[in-house]
Structure formats: C-alpha cells, structure tokens
C-alpha cells in the first residue's frame, strides 16, 4: 500500500475538532458493481447509503495518497464522519500552481506540497505544524496596509468576509426528514399493516407522518431564515491600500488589511487587533456581559506571541459593537484584520449552531432491531 502517512493523516491536532483524514479516488469497477447491486435490490440499498455516506464512498472509491485524492473521508474524535470533495482549481495569474483544497463545516483546508498535508486556512497566523504563530510586533509592521495585488491574492485564498447561512429548499428538507430512521420505521410498519389488510391503521399513520414532517420542515426553514437574517451583516469600511485610505465593502476585507475605525458606533465585521487608539466595546453578543469593555493597542513586543485568549483586551471580535473610539495623539484608530468569515469568533458560534455534535440515540439502534425482527416475522408468516 505504500507509505501509510501518504494515505491518511491528522489535521487540527490537539484541538477539539481534531480529525483523521483519508484519501480516495473514483473506481469505475466499484461504481458499476454498486449500481448493479442497487438495481437488483430495487433501490432499497439507497437508504443505507444515504444514512452512511462513508459506505457509499468506500463502495465507489479506492484508497489513495492524499495528494491524488478526489474525495476525503474525515473522522472526528467524537466518531463523526464527513465526506468532502477535493477541489482541483485551475491556475491563474494571481495564484499560479494552486494546490488542491476542500471545505469542511465552512472551513477551507488546502494541500501544502512542501509538508505533504492538508492544513486549515484560518487567518494571519501560520497554521503549519511547528509554527510558533505571530509575534505581537508583527502587527505594527503591517500598519501601512496591503497592496491591491496582495489583497486580491488573499481574497482568492481566504474567500469573501461573509457568514452566509444557506436556507435549504423545501424538497431537500423533506427528503432529509423522511429518510431518517424513525420515518423509515413508520414506512415499514405501514407496509406490514397494508399486507395484513389493516388499512385504517396504515392511513392514520401516513396522515400523522405527513403532518409531523410538514411541521418539522416548516419549523426548520423558519429557524434557518431567522439565523440567516441574524448573522448577515455588511458595511462600508475605510481601509488602507497602498498607503491610501479607500472605502471598501466589509465583504472584501482580508487578513492583513488595516481598517480605520470611526468615532461613532460601528459593528465589527471581522476579528482585528488594535494597534492605535482606544475603543469602548459592547461584547454582549458573544459573552452576554452587558458592561462595556475598553480595548487598548497590543504591545509592540517581539518576544510575545499573539493569542486571542491571552490578548483579549487588544482584540476586536467580529459581531461586537464599538460604542466609541478615541484616537491617540494625531493617529487614527487602526486595527489589523486577523480573521474573516467563518474563522472569526462570530463565525465559530454560527458553525456550532449549524454543525452541532451528533448524539448517538439508543432509540435508533432499537428501531433497527425492531425492523429486523419484524422482517423475520413477516417472512415466517408469508412462508
């Protein structure tokens, strides 16, 4: 099989979202064989494949080195599994020799050839293994802002600074709901009752299931729309580009940009590190604490490594409201953009809502056992 590490690896090591990653490539032979089995089974195998995407992946793909993978299988420390498609981009003038990448739970992971592994694109901090992060004085070296070409390159690398919540179409919500173990069990019970000529019971179960699915889909869609409206935000920000002040949409902010904060109230659209002036900030959206907090510039100390946890007083978090900013001497209130989009503190909260930790319900296991027992009884009864 070759070097095992080239076929699998670990990402986000030491973090709560640490995952083991496996590489897979499409196998024509396996795919044809699976489709033949699907036809012979009358399509019943589709349910199993939708419940467990990793099974479909293994039945249609072969294990391969991560560098050559078309899809990747991710296994978390909480026994969750995700199947993601690896995107192989075409080269451009700004991004020649682009490496492959994929998205998992709204986060981008890119292949780094020099270390032969995928790593998370999170912001200014270098996330490669062995990196010691950014020293605090580095933020002052960025005080003049980015060049337009550099900003455009980073925009293609990091993506737009937006937190977009998709509202799924109704038909997708219905399919996701009815393919769940509970409704499959209900369907199985209805079929058995129809076979035994208990039509009244079967019709009642069907009607109740339709009402239940409709109510669930309506509530899910309502909550998705409410979340989308709550997190969507955009404003016009003054940014330093090529040493000049220009007005840009907050969606165009990239890590390394220098933003100039106004004196009046404004909502932060990114995580940023304050390098000049003071700010009074309302962080109730993140912490629930109603008392305003004063933010001060980060120290210009090369021996200190920046950490959002340690340097909270120097960090302006996305989603928080700046009530008032006060310039120092003749300088404007400036901050260096540290993280954007779903990598921000606000983005992490939204991701926790969109992708909660899965719960292994004992009820589902019991449902499968019940279906198996009923299948045996029906088979015995028919014979």
Task: Give, region by region, the residue ranges found by the protein language model.
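Membrane-cytosol interface motif
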Residues: 64-77, 231-246
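Intrinsic-disorder signature of long, low-complexity extramembrane regions
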Residues: 1-147, 152-153, 207, 211, ...
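Cytosolic catalytic regions of P-type ion-transporting ATPases
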Residues: 97-115, 119-135, 235-365
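Extended, hydrophilic extramembrane loops/domains of integral membrane proteins
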Residues: 2-9, 141-162, 325-357
């Amino acid at each position: 099989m070759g070097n095992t590490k080239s076929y699998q690896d670990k990402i986000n090591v030491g973090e709560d979202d640490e995952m083991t990653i496996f590489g897979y490539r499409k196998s024509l032979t396996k795919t044809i064989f699976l489709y033949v089995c699907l036809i012979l089974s009358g399509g019943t195998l589709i349910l199993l494949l939708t419940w467990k995407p990793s099974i479909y992946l293994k039945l249609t793909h072969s294990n391969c080195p991560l560098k050559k993978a078309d899809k990747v299988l991710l296994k978390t420390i909480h026994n969750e599994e995700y199947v993601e498609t690896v995107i192989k981009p075409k080269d451009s003038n700004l991004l020649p020799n682009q490496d492959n990448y994929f998205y998992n739970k709204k986060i981008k992971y890119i292949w780094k050839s020099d270390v032969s592994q995928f790593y998370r694109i999170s912001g200014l901090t270098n996330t490669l293994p062995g990196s010691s992060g950014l020293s605090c004085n580095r933020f002052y070296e960025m005080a003049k802002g980015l060049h337009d070409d550099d900003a455009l390159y980073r925009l293609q690398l990091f993506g737009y600074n937006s937190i977009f919540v998709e509202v799924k179409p109704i038909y997708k919500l219905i399919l996701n709901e009815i393919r769940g173990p509970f409704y499959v069990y209900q369907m199985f019970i209805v079929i058995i009752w129809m076979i035994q000529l208990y039509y009244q019971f079967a019709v009642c179960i069907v009607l109740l299931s339709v009402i239940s699915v409709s109510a669930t889909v309506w509530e899910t869609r309502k909550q998705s729309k409410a979340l989308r409206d709550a997190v969507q935000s955009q404003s016009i920000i003054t940014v330093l580009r090529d040493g000049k002040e220009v007005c840009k949409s907050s969606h165009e902010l990239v890590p390394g940009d220098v933003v100039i904060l106004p004196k009046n109230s404004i909502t932060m659209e990114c995580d940023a590190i304050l390098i000049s002036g003071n700010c009074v900030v309302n962080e109730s959206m993140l912490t629930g604490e109603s008392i305003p907090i004063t933010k001060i510039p980060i120290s210009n100390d090369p021996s200190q490594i920046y950490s959002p946890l340690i340097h909270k007083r120097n960090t302006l978090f996305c989603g928080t409201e700046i009530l008032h900013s006060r310039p120092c001497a003749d300088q404007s209130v400036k901050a260096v953009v540290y993280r954007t989009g779903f990598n921000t503190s606000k983005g992490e909260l939204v991701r926790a809502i969109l992708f909660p930790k899965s719960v292994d319900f004992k009820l589902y296991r019991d449902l499968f056992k019940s279906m198996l027992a009923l299948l045996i009884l029906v088979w015995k009864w028919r014979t």
